[in-house]
């Protein structure tokens, strides 16, 4: 599966090299492509503004979310949010992840056709809400999905279109703002309740309420609310898309589903996966990483340049929008042999040709000071869900498909208009 925008950037890189300027002066674009370009971007984090780059995400994530935070505000907020998403915390959520995907699989019947992408969106949204914030938000998972959708629809349009919608107060803008108000009211009430009557399963909510930054300050209720919304939104929007692509690959690359199912059966012996089992699922981990390589959620990413920079003898003027690309980096043959082939075994440390990529060579979660704080959560959830799928079900793509599957949405790559599969077998949960 190839994405036209990504392919155009890849062709541009091969033709012009790592730096391409478009537009005039400080108001144009600079394309900085390839692994060394990524290293440069991550090493110069203080030269870019996230708030100016991602202002179009404010209606969804809120004005204090990490993705629109710069400098001291970003460091302070991240120092409170990040500890709750470290590996040892995420391991405690594996049982919740298993329970949520099992509930979805329990509803499947042999011969049934369904959009696996939509099924996974619902499962991941509830799993993320329950894992991080307990039942107090998990019970509202469907409501949150309904209210977030008009906001996500805004972000799938160019920023210029969103600004126009805001300026003219279009019906779509009004629907989105009304939805955000309903989300805010719900989460504000849950924050207030958690302060007065905390629960054992509040998990991340407890971290956000009681955590202190390195300077000893706590988050405001607005910052807590924006953190909750952005964690749920980013978690299910990107992870469900990546999972759909993983299933697409497993169903279209000969032998991959069988290899994954065989490994899960051998390692788990019919048990549900526990946190300690995941590292032993070498092939399945390869499926996850290979999916994130070929189908990175973000085809491109951008940074607004705050001060003049020099890269490889070329000046990058302040004010320009710098664009770099995981899609390009992940398809360079000098880094990835046979780059367009889906090869889970390239991630096996025991393979003769194994090569661990450098941080600037594999960037599905970006890198540097602004690397996605949910990376461990996402890869863990993908591994758990795929392990249950190959253990309990057999899927296939319909022999007669009514539409061609395409890649859509450069910010959270997803199959469009969905991924219809047929259930061949669905076994009861062990």
From Swiss-Prot:
Keyword Heme: yes
Keywords: Heme, Iron, Metal-binding, Monooxygenase, Oxidoreductase
Example GO molecular function: oxidoreductase activity, acting on paired donors, with incorporation or reduction of molecular oxygen
Keyword Ion transport recorded: no
Binding residues for heme: 372
Listed InterPro entries: Cyt_P450, Cyt_P450_CS, Cyt_P450_E_grp-IV, Cyt_P450_sf, Cytochrome_P450_monoxygenase
EC number: 1.14.-.-
CC per GO annotation: peptidoglycan-based cell wall
Gene3D superfamilies, per database record: Cytochrome P450
Cofactor (UniProt): heme
Family matches, as PROSITE patterns: CYTOCHROME_P450
Pfam family, any one: p450
Family per similarity comment: Belongs to the cytochrome P450 family.
Name of the protein: Putative cytochrome P450 139
Organism: Mycobacterium tuberculosis (strain ATCC 25618 / H37Rv)
